Design a protein with these regions (language model features):
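Hydrophobic beta-strand positions that form the internal "hydrophobic ladder"
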Residues: 47-50, 97-101, 146-147, 225-226, ...
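Active-site-proximal cap/loop segments of hydrolase catalytic domains
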Residues: 477-664
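A flexible loop/linker signature enriched in serine peptidases of the S9 family
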Residues: 54-67, 82-88, 103-115, 123, ...
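Non-catalytic accessory segments flanking enzyme active sites
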Residues: 42, 147-150, 156, 170-174, ...
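Short loop/turn segments that connect beta-strands within beta-propeller blades
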Residues: 72-76, 118-122, 197-201, 247-251, ...
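Residue-level detector of Asp-centered blade-edge/turn motifs that repeat once per structural unit
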Residues: 45-46, 95-96, 141-142, 220-221, ...
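Cap/lid segment of the alpha/beta-hydrolase catalytic domain
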Residues: 285, 400-521, 528, 560-563, ...
Length: 664
């Protein structure tokens, strides 16, 4: 069905005439591997410095490493704070501004501990020595104590024999939720909160029980800690969380439940006077990342009242990471909206919602302290960097990507909106190839995002830029099921995978043909995770595509029940497989594998328990048995994401080779 345009985005964005000079060269796979990622900005309490992480790929050791850097909040030369010999993460400033603390495991077999480094230099000092390691930490407001997140110990953690860690033991399982990708089989060990005074022998445990505790934040007076936990009768059968408070100096006191809502309450932040807590709330079950994702609102409550006040009731968009201003009058947060993440704010009473940065950028993170605010944001032509934000203006503090991208052409990107036959408005990002000629039509790759509850944004897409650098038009749509367009839109694929979203992505292709960009006879399609799943639904319903790449995707849906880690999601969205067998068959691309004529490359990690490799194996063997053009690539030791640099390179090169051979 042909798509009809209603209107364009604010402008046809980022044609980058100043970046694509005549002697610039195209982006390569090696360029992408050389790119470093900036993350986790933390402004010092006095506002003078910004600590952050830089993650890079060590191609010789074939692994990723992360170091901590800092830069003046007013600009200047960045300073490395940790060495390249080990990975360090989670930077946190001591309240007196003197020390920069972080998490690291310096030895090969060591567990993650808290380390501290004098801001002026010197060697880092190990602060904690927890046998099983720590999962997170935060300094108390007066700097005298540390809040730690520690998982319950296993038997080998309680012995001095290091070989005990290497002795395999049987997995004894009695939980409903018994698997997790990157973790493995789950036992009854949970993550709890502890408080630790540096120099003392052992931390003091604050929370316990058959529950996981997360998102802890100190109260301004340092006497209490707010945290998030699902303390229902069986958390494995319940997809909701509440905000709780525990008293630090009286661990035997009763834990106080702050919120009692049915859905997921998380991301608490204290008001400066300690009387209120703002947090993120959902009005229904929130199965993160799935089609069952309700709108996540900003809310607040006065301690002791159990009265939820939704501060963004008319804003049918997701919020994240709320933070009070120093005077307590304003709450800042990230706001997902129409292919973008804004830096937004609202008065503490829910009045005067403001999008503080009206630019075509994607805000990944922010930090505020003293009088300074910094944003970590990406642009279509530049990976995420750190900027100081002041009254609507941005001053760039880091330029990590420039050493790779200087002299490299980048594709122009525009976001277009078109109307479906039922009146639904759908958006897609269109990447034009380098040296684009408007008189020509180009081979085109339809690239689909994961989730489905996610969205393509005004951010630097390595995939989109790489394909465009190799002569492709790239279409990256936000079909129904995507976030950023309201709850009804996000729930448009509940138990209907491959229906409306299939129609929407095909309409994005048809609109590209109407624009004169797309060669209808040279179409490719691909994606990873739900992007791979939707790819499967595309190629089982149409033969318009000449090549496909399906990564970490779904085959026979019933085979995943109890095999991946989405058991509760399946039950809530699809119903039990023995009660609704027809629905489970309909939602299985494998049941239509005989319809696939598109040459398809199947990929996945051998250890993926998110969307297990059995799915790609099923789809591959079905096509192979039918005599179709297909190939399966399995990456040993990898989970849902491919992290080993040599495998990352292999995957990108295989993508290009597969599409080039069939579309050019």
């Amino acid at each position: 069905m042909a798509a009809t345009i209603l209107r364009l985005s604010l402008l046809t964005a980022f044609f980058l005439p100043t970046l694509n000079m005549a002697n610039d060269r195209p982006l390569t796979v090696d360029d992408l591997l050389a790119l470093e990622s900036v993350g986790n900005p933390q402004v010092s309490p006095d506002g003078q410095w910004v600590a952050y992480t830089i993650s890079s790929r060590d191609t010789e050791e074939d692994k990723r490493t992360t170091q901590i850097w800092m830069v003046s909040s007013d600009g200047g030369t960045p300073i490395p704070m940790t060495s390249a010999g080990y990975s360090a993460s989670n930077p946190r400033w001591s309240p007196d501004n003197k020390y920069l603390s972080f998490s690291a495991s310096k030895d090969e077999d060591a567990k993650s501990q808290v380390w501290s480094l004098n801001r002026l230099g010197g060697e880092a000092i190990q602060v904690t020595n927890v046998k099983q390691g720590i999962s997170g930490f935060e300094w108390s407001p007066d700097g005298s104590r540390l809040l730690l997140i520690i998982q319950d110990p296993k038997a080998s953690d309680l012995t001095e024999d290091k070989d005990d860690d290497k002795k395999p033991l049987p997995h004894v399982i009695d939980r409903m939720q018994f698997k997790r990708d990157y973790v493995g089989y789950l036992d009854r060990r949970r993550r709890h909160l502890y408080v630790y005074t540096p120099g003392s022998e052992n931390p003091t445990q604050l929370t316990s029980g058959d529950y996981d505790d997360s998102d802890p934040v100190w109260s301004p007076d340092g006497k209490s800690i707010a945290f998030v936990s699902d303390r229902s009768e069986d958390p494995d059968l319940h997809w909701g969380t509440d905000v709780w408070i525990v008293e630090v100096d009286d661990p035997d006191s009763e834990i106080i439940q702050v919120t009692t809502n049915e859905g997921r309450d998380d991301s608490p932040t204290w008001s400066p006077d300690g009387r209120s807590i703002a947090y993120r709330t959902a009005t229904g079950y929130d199965v993160g990342g799935s089609a069952l994702t309700p709108t996540r609102y900003l809310a607040s409550t006065v301690i002791g009242r159990d009265e939820r006040k939704i501060l963004t009731p008319e804003l049918d968009r997701n919020v994240a990471d709320p933070m009070y201003s120093a005077d307590g009058k304003t709450i800042y947060f990230k706001l997902e909206d129409s292919g973008q993440v804004h830096f937004a704010s609202v008065d503490k009473d829910g009045r005067r919602l403001i999008r503080n940065l009206e630019q075509q950028v994607n805000v990944r993170d922010f930090s505020m302290a003293g009088s300074k605010t910094v944003l970590l944001l990406g642009r279509p032509d530049q990976p995420a960097e750190i900027y100081q934000f002041n009254d609507g203006t941005l001053d760039q503090l880091t330029n990590v990507s420039n050493k790779v991208l200087d002299g490299v052409s980048r594709a122009s990107v525009e976001k277009l909106e078109f109307e479906r036959a039922d009146g639904t408005l759908v958006e897609a990002f269109y990447y034009r190839p380098i040296d684009f000629d408007s008189s020509k039509r180009y081979p085109t790759i339809l690239w689909l995002h994961g989730g489905p509850a996610s969205q393509f944004t005004y951010d630097f897409s390595t995939t989109g830029q790489l394909y465009a650098a190799n002569g492709y038009v790239v279409i990256m749509p936000n079909p129904r099921g995507s976030v950023g367009y309201g709850e009804e839109f996000a729930k448009g694929t509940v138990a209907k995978w491959g229906e409306r979203d299939f129609e929407d992505v095909m309409a994005a292709v048809d609109y590209g043909i109407e624009l004169g960009l797309v060669d209808a006879n040279r179409l490719g399609v691909g994606g990873w995770s739900y992007g791979g799943i939707l790819t499967n639904f595309v190629i089982t319903q149409t033969d318009r595509f000449k090549a496909a790449m399906s990564g970490a995707s779904l085959g026979l849906t019933t085979a995943n029940y109890g095999h991946d880690h989405y058991q509760l999601m399946y039950e809530l969205e699809f119903g039990l497989p023995w009660e609704f067998p027809e629905r489970w068959v309909k939602l299985s691309p494998f049941s239509k594998v005989q319809n696939i004529t598109t040459p398809t490359l199947w990929m996945g990690g051998a250890l993926d328990w998110n969307v297990p490799i059995i799915n790609s194996e099923q789809m591959y063997i079905g096509m192979k048995r039918l005599g179709r053009d297909t190939q399966l690539v399995v990456y040993p030791g990898e989970h849902h994401g491919i992290r080993r640099p040599s495998f990352e390179k292999d995957r990108l090169e295989r993508w290009l080779a597969w599409f080039d051979e069939r579309l050019k």
